[in-house]
Amino acid sequence: MFWLGFGLLLLALSLYLLYVFERQSRIDRLTHKWPAPPALPFIGHLHILAKLVGPHPLRRATEMINEHLHDHRAKLWMGTKLYLVDCNPKDIQALCSAQQLLQKTNDYRVFENWLCEGLFTSGFEKWSHRRKIVMPAFNYTMIKQFVAVFEKQSRILLTNVAKFAESGDQIDFLQLISCFTLDTICETALGVSVGSQSSAKSEYLDAVKSILVIIDKRLKNIFYRNSFIFKRTSHYKREQELIKTLHGFTEGIIQKRIDEINQDAENRNYQSSDAELDGVKRTLCFLDTLLLSKGPDGKPLTVKDIREEVDTIIFGGFDLTATTLNFFMYNMTLHPEHQQRCREEVWSVCGKDKSEPISIEQVRQLEFLEACIKETLRMYPSGPLTARKATANCTINDFFIPKGSDVIISPIYMGRCKDFFPDPMVFKPDRWAIGAEPKIEATTFIPFMAGARSCMGQRYAMVMLKMVLAHLLRNFLFEPLGERQVKLKLNFVITLHTVEPYLCRAKNLD
C-alpha cells in the first residue's frame, strides 16, 4: 500500500513537472524576441536574482540590470513566474497605455493592510472609477486656489529653518520637509489643518516610516509575502499597531471635515462639485469630492472607501514629494554654483524682499529652478521602478507579452542610462534648457510614469516644489555637512531614500 501511494505521488509530481516544463517552453517560444541570460530548468534565473540578497540591494539591482538588459529589454524567470523588463523608450507609451497592462502586480498587495484598495493598489475597474471622481480636484484651476496654502505653509517652514540658521545646528532636512509636505497635502487636498510643522513630534510620520520598513521586509522576503506566514510573525503584530495609528489619523481627518461641513452656514455650497465662493466658481477639494461621490452601485462611498483614498493621497502627496525635496537640496549643497543661479533667478523674478508672497505667475517663470527639479527627478526618482501585470496576451512593437507575466519599468535605470542622457551621473540642469542638444525624448524621463496610470498630482507637485524652494533659496544659503554628506548612499525602501539622514546647515541671507 505504501509503495502504491508513493508511486502515485511520484507520478503526480512527474506530471506536474512535465506540465511546468512544457508551459515554460511554450512561453519561451512565444517570447523568443525578448533577450534573456541562460536559464536553469524549473528555477529559471533564480541563481541570478539571488545576487540581490545582501547589502546594497539597489546597487546590486542596477548592476544586474546593466549586465542583462539588451536594447533596454530583458526576460527573467523567477521559478515559474515570468518577468519582462522593458525600459526601451519606443515601448513606454504603448506599455503604459495598453488596456492589458493597467493592473498593478501582486507585489503591491503588501500595501493592502494599510492602503486597502486605494488608487495606488486597486484593480483596473475600481481604479478607473475612482480616478474619474478625484481628477477634478487636481486640475489647474484648483492648483491656483492652493497657492495661498503653499504660501502659508512655506512661511511656517521658513520660521523653523530660521531657528536652525540662528543656532547653527545641523538640519535633518527630510524630517523638516516631511512635516511641511504633510501639512500642505492635508490642507489642500483634504481641507483640514493638522499642524505637524508646529509640533515637536509627529506620531503619524513616525508610523509611516516604521510601516514602510515592514512593507520593505515583506517585499524582499518571499516567505513574508505569504499572508499565512506573515500573520504569525512579530512584524504583523507591529504592523497592526502602526495601522491603528495611521487609520486613526485619517479617520480623524475625515470626521473633522464632515463636522466642518455640517457646521458651515453655507452648507448648500457642498451640494455640487462646482460650488461658488465669493461669486467665483470653484472645484471641491479631494476629500469633499469623495464625501459627495457615489460608487458604481449608486450608493455613497463608505468611510472605508474614503479612508483608503485619503491614506493613498497622503502617502503619495507627502512622502514622495518630501524625498524629491530632500534630493534637490542635496544637489544644491553639492553644487553651490547651481544653488546660487537658482537664487539669482528667484531674486530676478520674485524680488529680494523676503516678506513678499510668490505668485503662481512668478512660479511659472522660474525655468532654471524647474530644470534643477527635473534633473533631480532624473537622477533620484522617488519611485525607482513600477510593475504591471498582463491581464491578457498583448504585443508591444512585435514583442509578445503573455497573460500572467509581470512587466517592469524602471525610471531610475532610464534616467541614468548613457544612451538617453550623456554623462548621466553628472548633475546638468542645462540639459533641460529650451533648444538644448541632444533633445530629451519625453519617454526617457518618466518620474511620474506615463499613460493612463501616471501620477495625477504631478502638476500640483511641480507648483508646490517650485514655490517652497523659491522661498527657501530666497531666505537661506544651504551648505553640506562634511564629506559623509557629499558621498550619499541610497536605499530602495519602496521609494528612494538615503541610507543615513541627509544633514545640512542653513545660513541667513542678508
From Swiss-Prot:
<keyword id="KW-0479">Metal-binding</keyword>
<dbReference type="GO" id="GO:0016705">
    <property type="term" value="F:oxidoreductase activity, acting on paired donors, with incorporation or reduction of molecular oxygen"/>
</dbReference>
<dbReference type="InterPro" id="IPR002403">
    <property type="entry name" value="Cyt_P450_E_grp-IV"/>
</dbReference>
<protein>
    <recommendedName>
        <fullName>Probable cytochrome P450 312a1</fullName>
        <ecNumber>1.14.-.-</ecNumber>
    </recommendedName>
</protein>
<keyword id="KW-0492">Microsome</keyword>
<comment type="similarity">
    <text>Belongs to the cytochrome P450 family.</text>
</comment>
<dbReference type="InterPro" id="IPR050196">
    <property type="entry name" value="Cytochrome_P450_Monoox"/>
</dbReference>
<dbReference type="GO" id="GO:0005789">
    <property type="term" value="C:endoplasmic reticulum membrane"/>
</dbReference>
<dbReference type="GO" id="GO:0005506">
    <property type="term" value="F:iron ion binding"/>
</dbReference>
<keyword id="KW-0503">Monooxygenase</keyword>
<keyword id="KW-0560">Oxidoreductase</keyword>
<dbReference type="Pfam" id="PF00067">
    <property type="entry name" value="p450"/>
</dbReference>
<feature type="binding site" description="axial binding residue">
    <location>
        <position position="455"/>
    </location>
    <ligand>
        <name>heme</name>
    </ligand>
</feature>
<keyword id="KW-0256">Endoplasmic reticulum</keyword>
<dbReference type="GO" id="GO:0020037">
    <property type="term" value="F:heme binding"/>
</dbReference>
<dbReference type="InterPro" id="IPR036396">
    <property type="entry name" value="Cyt_P450_sf"/>
</dbReference>
<dbReference type="GO" id="GO:0004497">
    <property type="term" value="F:monooxygenase activity"/>
</dbReference>
<dbReference type="InterPro" id="IPR001128">
    <property type="entry name" value="Cyt_P450"/>
</dbReference>
<keyword id="KW-0472">Membrane</keyword>
<comment type="function">
    <text>May be involved in the metabolism of insect hormones and in the breakdown of synthetic insecticides.</text>
</comment>
<keyword id="KW-0349">Heme</keyword>
<keyword id="KW-0408">Iron</keyword>
